[in-house]
Structures are given as structure tokens and as C-alpha cells.
């Protein structure tokens, strides 16, 4: 069995988180913003699972990953509902136009 060092997992997780952060900061489409947040959460999940490789008898990484996935699913559902409601009202997906609190 080939053993992959923990550093590889952490580098991949850091790259995923960086891509998600850049996508969140540079893009203006609300759907792309949601996908960037999900990408960052998946990077966190990869880090938590990599923690389990270092501590194989401690299942905290897998348990936290399960909770993060459950919360991410709820966040995606609520976020998509908000984006759809915003699109119905404004007919646009740009986050710059999200000034509904300003009349």
C-alpha cells in the first residue's frame, strides 16, 4: 500500500482554499460566490480528514467533516433559495446589485 505524506493533503487543501478565496474575492456572480464558499469548505474537509491520517484512533476529523458537510448542504440550499429570490426580484445575478436594504 502506498502511503501519501500528510503534507500532500495539506498542500492540496491549501490550494483548494486559495482558489475558493480568490473566486470569492474577484467574482461578482452570486452563484460563483456560493461555489467558491463550497470549495473553501471542501478544503477544510480535506484538512480534517488529513488529521485522521496523523491520528488514526481519533475520529474527531471524520466527525467534524460529517458536520461540515451537513452544514454546507443546508447553507447551499438556503443560499440558492436567496439567490433565486434575488434573481426573481432584480433579474440579475451580480452581487453589486444586491442593495435591497437601500431603497
Curated annotation (Swiss-Prot):
Disulfide bonds: none annotated. Its EC number is 7.1.1.-. It comes from the Bacteria. One of its GO terms (molecular function) is NADH:ubiquinone reductase (non-electrogenic) activity. The keyword Nucleus does not apply. InterPro entries: NADH_UbQ_OxRdtase_chain4L/K, NUOK/Mnh_C1-like. One of its GO terms (cellular component) is NADH dehydrogenase complex. It is an enzyme of class 7 (translocase). Keywords: Cell inner membrane, Cell membrane, Membrane, NAD, Quinone, Translocase, Transmembrane, Transmembrane helix, Transport, Ubiquinone. It catalyses: a quinone + NADH + 5 H(+)(in) = a quinol + NAD(+) + 4 H(+)(out). It is found in: Cell inner membrane. The chain crosses the membrane at residues 6-26, 30-50, 66-86. It is a multi-pass membrane protein. GO terms for biological process: ATP synthesis coupled electron transport. Its main location: membrane. It holds the Pfam family Oxidored_q2. NDH-1 shuttles electrons from NADH, via FMN and iron-sulfur (Fe-S) centers, to quinones in the respiratory chain. The immediate electron acceptor for the enzyme in this species is believed to be ubiquinone. Couples the redox reaction to proton translocation (for every two electrons transferred, four hydrogen ions are translocated across the cytoplasmic membrane), and thus conserves the redox energy in a proton gradient. Belongs to the complex I subunit 4L family. PANTHER family: NADH-UBIQUINONE OXIDOREDUCTASE CHAIN 4L, NADH-UBIQUINONE OXIDOREDUCTASE SUBUNIT ND4L. NDH-1 is composed of 14 different subunits. Subunits NuoA, H, J, K, L, M, N constitute the membrane sector of the complex. This is NADH-quinone oxidoreductase subunit K. The gene is nuoK.
